Amino acid sequence: MHLSEIVHPNQLHGLSISELKQIANQIREKHLDTVATSGGHLGPGLGVVELTLALYQTLDLDQDKVVWDVGHQAYPHKLITGRYERFHTLRQKDGVAGYLNRRESKFDHFGAGHASTSISSVLGMALARDAKGENFKTVAVIGDGAMTGGMALEAINHAGHLPHTRMLVILNDNDMSISPNVGAMSRYLNKMRLSPPIQFLSDNFEEQLKQLPFGEQVAPDLKRLKGGMKRLAVSKVGAVFEELGFTYIGPVDGHSLEELLATFKEAHLHEGPVLVHVATTKGKGYAIAEQDQVSYHAQSPFNLETGKAKPSNKPKPPSYSKVFAETLIKMAENDIRVVGITAAMATGTGLDKLQAKLPKQYIDVGIAEQHAVTLAAGMACEGMRPVVAIYSTFLQRGYDQIIHDVCIQNLPVFFCLDRAGIVGADGPTHQGMYDIAYLRCLPNMVMMAPKDEAELQQMLVTGINYTDGPIAMRYPRGSGLGVGLMEEGWEPLPIGKAETLRHGDDVLLLAYGTMVNLASQVADMLTEHGVRATVVNARFAKPLDTELIIPLAQKIGQVVTLEEGCLPGGFGSAVLEALMDHQVMAPVTRIGVPDQLVEHATPDQSKAELGLTPAQVAERVLGLLKQKPAPSYVS
């Protein structure tokens, strides 16, 4: 059987080990070819090929349910659940999603994108099954990185107290998340997988035995001895999970189909919660990825032979993340109070550079955004200048801590929100749409966004120097605009002050962050139609520069707000509130992301679909100006 013939995972039933190995090779080949061509997650999926095949051969996927934590390791799952023919569309507009998506396949039982959710969701399914008197298996596959997340440990704690609730947790232990794992749990798991008795008993035991004199004759007795020794070792290394109420099995060689099949069959016999500890290699089967597991966690299109990214058509300016990291390092070198904090995203945020240069001023808390926020709050209490560098979408996970531990106590924590706005191929779980809305409503919070990478440097200085309370800066994924950068001598910006970039009497364009450059392009287009626009770089969504905005709105009378974020509760809403508070009844048109999910596509495709290209915005503004009402005031 060829991989292309598999449209249902139950077709794996009855296949021999040899046939499964052939399918495994074909999965890796398809996986590599697709990611090399279009980009995507590489290492995670390559590491779970045998795990996926062995697990699915022991399940009835017409009724049993498997949830993959995060989902970026689920490419093999997608390839054997009817998506082989469309897999070349991976992460492309209207194509196969890069993560699990309930709308995409009946085999994607729970959507994901953020870590540590699988055990909770699978336990919920198991409890619902039992309440309805049904009979199917529920399985969570979770990485050792995600297992460090508090939510996963909360679910383990709950499930362990339900001895008659049948569920299986598979711990995919490759000693990595995106970057190398940190923390006591990671250290414990590493000790388990490297335990000498288990290493000895797992490494080609039978093959080595047969090479000894009389090896064939004593093999049965020694295999029984091996089993006893391994159970003794496991009783020690699996003690934490056993004490929490799980039956622990492992560590198991995650690339041995024989061992995986036997283990999963055994695990399915237990009535209560079971944890199978599977040791895998991230990037398995592609030597370049195995040797550099951080870089090859995910890749843009690359050359399979060399592993190097395919050259772009033209050189790009440095990314916002790179400018952020390099500027932060220079500030940290001059102030030992400055500490960079990340939640398992050192490479993505650029803080790996800070770690390399100033390791004592760098903290990685693991996949623990809640802890990162309150840790920063505690450091701020002692006069430190904590800089929490985190993706916009992931800061959502620490929201209560932002309110309870930072804002209520008015502590000077600096939140740097990378990947704010439209991020592209990762889809709705990773879009940075909501931070303006969810931070703007919090007392004491200051919010700013740079128009370009040079202003990011100024805002970084502003945030670190600001000691009157919490402050946040959002900035996008990808390259800057190519403006000149200063090596030093940055001056902090006055809090809550905007800047006027262009003057005109026909329409007021109030832009925030990345939309400032677009507003300038729109103004150029409007000029060609005889329309003169005032363009304002708001800089701050909170506090708004009402001293500048209110008189301009009164004078010009037609206001358009521009933001790369959700419209409900966003920057445009803030402007509307300010105008109403000042009894200015100028018409306001808010342009941004409407109240909908933004699916996976390139950022340019998403912006075009949302009407956020310069030409689309200019056309909309021209339509507004056909009937321009005069400004008025509330009586």
From Swiss-Prot:
Q: Name one GO biological process term.
A: isopentenyl diphosphate biosynthetic process, methylerythritol 4-phosphate pathway
EC number(s) recorded for this UniProt protein: 2.2.1.7
**SMART domains cross-referenced by the UniProt entry:** Transket_pyr (SM00861)
Pfam families the UniProt entry points to = DXP_synthase_N, Transket_pyr, Transketolase_C
Q: Choose one Gene Ontology CC annotation of this protein and give it.
A: cytosol
Binding site residues for thiamine diphosphate: H72, G113, H114, A115, G145, A146, N174, Y286, E369
Cofactor dependence: Mg(2+); thiamine diphosphate
Could you confirm whether the keyword Metal-binding appears in this record? yes
The record's comment on cofactor binding reads: Binds 1 Mg(2+) ion per subunit. Binds 1 thiamine pyrophosphate per subunit.
Q: Which positions make up the signal peptide?
A: none
Q: Which GO terms describe its molecular function?
A: 1-deoxy-D-xylulose-5-phosphate synthase activity; magnesium ion binding; thiamine pyrophosphate binding
Identify the domain of life: Bacteria
Subunit structure comment from the entry: Homodimer.
The protein's role, per its UniProt record: Catalyzes the acyloin condensation reaction between C atoms 2 and 3 of pyruvate and glyceraldehyde 3-phosphate to yield 1-deoxy-D-xylulose-5-phosphate (DXP).
Q: What is this protein called in UniProt? A: 1-deoxy-D-xylulose-5-phosphate synthase
Q: Which organism is it from?
A: Acaryochloris marina (strain MBIC 11017)
Gene encoding this polypeptide? dxs
